[in-house]
């Protein structure tokens, strides 16, 4: 337990930020999983494309704001793009 008033405040801030960061990362994982499920279900290309766009947009935002490392965001975008392009060619 913090002994100083400022340390108590820092603890509260840290807990709030941690919860916010976890929520953002969880939202990203959900978007990626939704895209993968649509591909597995052989959904319409337009549905998969909208899921792809939202996932890439979220990756860009989290990478720029350092919620995830920029290189990780780039790597995930590349993986999703390959997955989407493979699906689009198969259609």
Swiss-Prot record:
Q: Which GO molecular-function terms appear in the entry?
A: small ribosomal subunit rRNA binding; structural constituent of ribosome
- Any single GO CC term annotated in Swiss-Prot or TrEMBL for this entry: cytosol
User: Origin, by domain of life?
Assistant: Bacteria
| BP-aspect Gene Ontology terms | translation
User: Which Pfam family, just one, is annotated for this protein?
Assistant: Ribosomal_S20p
Q: Name the segments for region: Disordered.
A: 1-25
Q: Which keywords accompany this UniProt record?
A: Ribonucleoprotein, Ribosomal protein, RNA-binding, rRNA-binding
Record flagged with keyword Ribonucleoprotein = yes
Which residue windows does the record flag with biased composition (Basic and acidic residues)? 1-18
RNA-binding recorded as keyword: yes
Name the InterPro entries for this protein: Ribosomal_bS20, Ribosomal_bS20_sf
Q: What does this protein do?
A: Binds directly to 16S ribosomal RNA.
- Which protein family is it in? Belongs to the bacterial ribosomal protein bS20 family.
User: What name appears for this protein in its UniProt entry?
Assistant: Small ribosomal subunit protein bS20
Q: Which organism is it from?
A: Chlorobium luteolum (strain DSM 273 / BCRC 81028 / 2530) (Pelodictyon luteolum)
Gene name of the encoded protein: rpsT
């Amino acid at each position: 337990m913090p002994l100083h008033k400022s340390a108590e405040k820092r603890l509260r801030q840290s807990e709030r930020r941690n919860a916010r960061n976890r929520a953002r990362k969880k939202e990203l994982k959900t978007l990626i999983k939704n895209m993968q499920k649509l591909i597995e279900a052989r959904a319409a290309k337009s549905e998969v494309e909208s899921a792809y766009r939202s996932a890439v947009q979220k990756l860009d935002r989290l990478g720029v704001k350092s919620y995830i490392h920029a290189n990780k965001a780039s790597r995930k975008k590349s993986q999703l793009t390959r997955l989407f392009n493979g699906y689009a060619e198969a259609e």
